[in-house]
């Protein structure tokens, strides 16, 4: 995940852009930080999904097949 300083900088640039236009350098920095944030978020979300098992009230595994396949592929990588 991104450091707190990077998250603060993302918010600082977002707030500044609402008040005044960003410079070209600031716009490039904002884009780079947002890309890094999205990569970290997606990676974290994927890790969470790879550990999920869905069961109904009766205890039957109802995890979608697509997710089961992705989990199996992930296990085989390691």
Curated annotation (Swiss-Prot):
SUPFAM superfamilies: YnzC-like. Residues 57-78 are annotated as: Disordered. GO terms for cellular component: cytoplasm. Keywords: Cytoplasm. It is found in: Cytoplasm. Gene3D superfamilies: Helix hairpin bin. Residues 63-78 have a biased composition (Basic and acidic residues). Its main location: cytoplasm. InterPro entries: DUF896. HAMAP family: UPF0291 (MF_01103). Belongs to the UPF0291 family. This is UPF0291 protein Exig_1097. It comes from Exiguobacterium sibiricum (strain DSM 17290 / CCUG 55495 / CIP 109462 / JCM 13490 / 255-15). The lineage of its organism: Bacteria, Bacillati, Bacillota, Bacilli, Bacillales.
């Amino acid at each position: 995940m991104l450091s707190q300083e990077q998250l603060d900088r993302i918010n600082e640039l977002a707030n500044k852009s609402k008040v005044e236009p960003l410079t070209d350098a600031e716009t490039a920095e904002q884009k780079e930080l947002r890309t890094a944030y999205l990569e970290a978020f997606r990676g974290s979300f994927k890790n969470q999904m790879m550990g999920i098992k869905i069961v109904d009230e009766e205890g039957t595994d109802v995890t979608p097949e697509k997710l089961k396949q992705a989990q199996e592929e992930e296990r085989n990588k390691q």
